[in-house]
């Protein structure tokens, strides 16, 4: 598996799993009626990478400053792994890449603003990579399966 910078030509291969993950209603608060055209600028803005193996895109991550201006020394990232590729280390590879990228880009820290508390695999992965839960905003996400659940704010000094 390689992690490489995404190109515009990658979007048609990212969109199917992006659409499915959003439609599942368990991890992202994007509107469910997004089209490929309206979703593209939401994901393909900033430093975007893909995890690819044998020409198949297994997942993607986007990174950049968490806030503009005086908050721009803190980075953030978002991740999507094709459900068909889960359990193959794709999320870990993308997470490790994001942390390394943020360090190399001179960020002071990395903050994830909205990790759904019922996404226990992601929570455990981010903790294994050195993130800690700063707080949980109660009932901040409408999970399709679990109803209203908390959103963790996770943080790591780089």
Question: Residue ranges of each PLM-predicted region?
Answer:
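Acetyl-CoA-dependent GNAT
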Residues: 8, 27-84, 95-97, 101, ...
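Conserved beta-strand-loop-alpha-helix junction that forms the acyl-donor binding cleft
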Residues: 112-122, 140-142
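Helix-loop element at the rim of GNAT/NAT acetyltransferase active sites that forms part
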Residues: 15-32
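Conserved acetyl-CoA-binding loop-helix of GNAT-fold acetyltransferases
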Residues: 87-102, 123-128
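Short hydrophobic/aromatic beta-strand or adjacent loop that forms the aromatic wall/cage
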Residues: 46, 148-153
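A short beta-loop-alpha structural element at the N-terminal edge
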Residues: 1-14
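Conserved acetyl-CoA-binding loop of GNAT-fold acetyltransferases
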Residues: 127-137
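Conserved GNAT acetyl-CoA-binding A-motif
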Residues: 102-115
């Amino acid at each position: 598996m390689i992690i490489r910078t995404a190109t515009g030509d990658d979007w048609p291969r990212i969109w199917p799993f992006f659409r499915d993950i959003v439609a599942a209603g368990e991890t992202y608060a994007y509107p469910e009626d997004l089209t490929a055209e309206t979703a593209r600028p939401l994901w393909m803005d900033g430093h975007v990478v893909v995890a690819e193996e044998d020409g198949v895109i297994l997942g993607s991550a986007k990174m950049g400053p968490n806030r503009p201006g005086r908050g721009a020394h803190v980075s953030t990232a978002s991740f999507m792994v094709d459900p068909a590729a889960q359990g193959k280390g794709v999320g870990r590879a993308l997470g490790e890449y994001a942390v390394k990228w943020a360090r190399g880009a001179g960020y002071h820290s990395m903050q994830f603003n909205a990790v759904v508390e019922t996404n226990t695999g992601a929570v455990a992965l981010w903790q294994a990579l050195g993130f800690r839960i700063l707080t949980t905003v109660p009932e901040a996400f409408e999970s399709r399966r679990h109803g209203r659940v908390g959103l963790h704010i996770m943080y790591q000094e780089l």
